[in-house]
Amino acid sequence: MSLFLSFFISILLCFFNGATTTQFDFSTLAISNLKLLGDARLSNGIVGLTRDLSVPNSGAGKVLYSNPIRFRQPGTHFPTSFSSFFSFSITNVNPSSIGGGLAFVISPDANSIGIAGGSLGLTGPNGSGSKFVAVEFDTLMDVDFKDINSNHVGFDVNGVVSSVSGDLGTVNIDLKSGNTINSWIEYDGLTRVFNVSVSYSNLKPKVPILSFPLDLDRYVNDFMFVGFSGSTQGSTEIHSIEWWSFSSSFGSSLGSGSGSPPPRANLMNPKANSVKSPPPLASQPSSSAIPISSNTQLKTSSSSSCHSRFCKENPGTIAGVVTAGAFFLALFAGALFWVYSKKFKRVERSDSFASEIIKAPKEFSYKELKAGTKNFNESRIIGHGAFGVVYRGILPETGDIVAVKRCSHSSQDKKNEFLSELSIIGSLRHRNLVRLQGWCHEKGEILLVYDLMPNGSLDKALFESRFTLPWDHRKKILLGVASALAYLHRECENQVIHRDVKSSNIMLDESFNAKLGDFGLARQIEHDKSPEATVAAGTMGYLAPEYLLTGRASEKTDVFSYGAVVLEVVSGRRPIEKDLNVQRHNVGVNPNLVEWVWGLYKEGKVSAAADSRLEGKFDEGEMWRVLVVGLACSHPDPAFRPTMRSVVQMLIGEADVPVVPKSRPTMSFSTSHLLLSLQDTLSDCNTVALNSSRSSSWSVPEHNVIIRSDDDHLV
């Protein structure tokens, strides 16, 4: 008990010294907590700093936390320690036009924004504007600003000429990749050291990319605003802040874990921050010099001696503090006991289930999801996933519109498949993956809650919409799915094999950005480990032939499925065309899409595979490139298929497309007793036929192939 009392007294003494602690974090950035300037906007919990346009433009946007934060103690000007973790992405709609970047910024000004272009929205014309401290992530090498290259991080004070810079290529980070990038920015007010770390992983690197001494109190006022600024410079870059946390305190170092994301999950709803109605911003002079550490030694004993004098001169006050501390601790313990007893009495839950999903984002109550879906009314059904029905729901507390997937299977095996979706996607974060908001396990039900995608699934946009999906949207969708798969295969902690990439599992947001969903069949594999044989499952037309025969899913099986999606999106035809009398296709056309496109490629007219509904409104060079990439991904031999990272590079023009043979190769899979050709596996659009007439001691059992209908739709 004495330990708690000592801690409580030390906290109260911090208040006597006028110290202020600030802490906040967001999963869905609430508009009430943010101040948006310029082109900045909030959509689906993501802050966009610049405009989402397909034509080159110049603009700037800024987002700030709405309350000023104390950065110096009153009187002493002692600097705060702070830590900020955030996830961001920089995507280029048109890879040929690059220029701009974003910055984490600390500024006394919450009402103005700098100019577009290379200034990142930080400064006005000719470098004018308010004072600031910033960490920039720059995608353009500007000699006027002494940039080291077009892929760097830099530390700026009152201008965009960085005093310290780091090449992100040295840590294998590509700002323009479109992938989610995590950054940790930390300042220790005791040691006066400023650190910047960057990674694709949720784990903070052991060695920061920037680390240098800094007297922060020379460059900040007592109160400052924190946030982000971004700009474009005649480009189509989109700068997005996907998640953000911030914490600060006086008189102590923030631990190494400060500002890090919660374990393998997206974050919860915004927490109430501890900022206490600070006084108006003081107008303090700020040096414009580039930060160079002084040799000023920090007298850490001064605060403790101050505490000692206070204790000697005010014994009555200290006694009162101790008494009050004991009372409030007892009150706090009683409140905790009451809250937890109510929680445990509320509903029975499976302990084993809770341990499996400890990494998931948020737990919803069955009551609120039932109310949000009108008692799971049939009128709210918007699709069917691999293992459940998907409902449109409205969360009663927030009014957010969500998609609720309800497990429709009672067997434990099916529930385990359903749970795999939760355990996998809950640990992932990428702008082209459907975001899992939370879960519920009550009354024998398993429910998953996702962001609702207003434009539905890709297959509905292709085949059921009254409007033709334009070529620019199709290109963006294919690039988004490729980026998501590249992330799953090589850029997250454990490799994730999706195993069910198809158009009905690709969702479209309000801007027709692709979001890959349905991880019910996905499997996690440690990098560089061989996959184990499992039951082959998926949808005919998207399944790689070697996966059908061996049951071993690898990243190349996902590549094959992606190739089928590419050809489907470009041609407007399903991988296996069941209706040969569709008006826009001639009667007698090969029902197998890959074979049909490969035949056109052999004849030198592969662009004829383009969807006739596009009416020729596309660039033929782009069309040819995308179709050849689709054929390369559809190669019967997995060894000749590209990786998804190389596919991304091909689509944006950073790499040449591979040489694809004019005739479709005939790949055979054999053991000492079996030779089974590709045609044997894909000749039937509804079944998988194994030629039993061949003499063999080895076979693929019929129950090892699960074919799913193209009518499966999910979120």
Curated annotation (Swiss-Prot):
Membrane topology, from the record: Single-pass type I membrane protein
Signal peptide segment: 1-21
Matching PANTHER family: PTHR27007
Pfam families in the cross-refs: Lectin_legB (PF00139), Pkinase (PF00069)
Glycosylation site residues: 126, 195
Keywords assigned: ATP-binding, Cell membrane, Glycoprotein, Kinase, Lectin, Membrane, Nucleotide-binding, Receptor, Serine/threonine-protein kinase, Signal, Transferase, Transmembrane, Transmembrane helix
Topology, Extracellular side: 22-317
Protein's UniProt keywords contain Transmembrane helix: yes
Assigned protein family: In the C-terminal section; belongs to the protein kinase superfamily. Ser/Thr protein kinase family.
InterPro entries xrefs: ConA-like_dom_sf, Kinase-like_dom_sf, L-type_Lectin-RKs, Lectin_legB_Mn/Ca_BS, Legume_lectin_dom, Prot_kinase_dom, Protein_kinase_ATP_BS, Ser/Thr_kinase_AS
Organism: Arabidopsis thaliana
Domain Protein kinase: 376-676
Protein name: L-type lectin-domain containing receptor kinase VIII.1
Organism phylogeny: Eukaryota, Viridiplantae, Streptophyta, Embryophyta, Tracheophyta
Catalyzed chemical reaction(s): L-seryl-[protein] + ATP = O-phospho-L-seryl-[protein] + ADP + H(+); L-threonyl-[protein] + ATP = O-phospho-L-threonyl-[protein] + ADP + H(+)
Protein EC: 2.7.11.1
Catalytic center residues: 500
